[in-house]
Amino acid sequence: MSVQCKEIQYGVYGRCLEMSNKLCRLVVTLDKGPHIICYQLHGEPNVMHEDREDATTQKGPDFDNYFYPGAVWHIYGGHRLWLSPESMPETYYPDNFAVPYTVEGNTITLTPKEQEGNHVQLVFRITLEENGTKATIAHTIYNRDTAPKTFAPWGLSVLAPGGVEIVPQADKPTGLL
C-alpha cells in the first residue's frame, strides 16, 4: 500500500486531510490551521493532544487591534508552526481560516494565507514514508512585509498525556545545541 491522501471530516475540526499507509495515519486540519491534529499507528490512540472542548483560547482588545476585530486564538492541539520569541499577541495568530493544499505523491503542501498583522506566510510540507511510520515536516516562513523581521521558526507539538516525541539532534560535536 502506498500513501493514500483523502479529505475527511474529523470530529470538531471539520474538513481535514488524512494521509495514511499500511502502518499509520496523520490528519491535518483544512478548515483552520494547519495543525497536524492526529498521528497514530493503526489500532493505537492518537499521540497528539486534541482540545475538543476548545478550553484554551486567547482574545481581547490586543487581538482585535493587532489582527482584526473579533480575533480569537485557539490552541486546537497537535503540531503547528509558531514564531519565536513568544510574544502576546503577535505569536498567538488566530489561524481560523481554510488552508489550501496540494498533493504530490506521498507529500502534501499546505499554504495558509498571509497572517494579518504579522505579514508572514507559513508553508507546511509533510512527507509520509510509504512503508514506515516516519513523517518528515518541512516548515517555511516567508516575510511578506516591506520591512525586515527578526524571528525564528518554532515547530511546536502538543502531545496527549503520556505522548512521546523523538526529535533528531545534531550528531556532530560542535559544542552547541
For each of these PLM feature ranges, what is it?
Residues M1-T136, Y142-L177:
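Surface-exposed acidic/polar loop and edge beta-strand patches at domain peripheries
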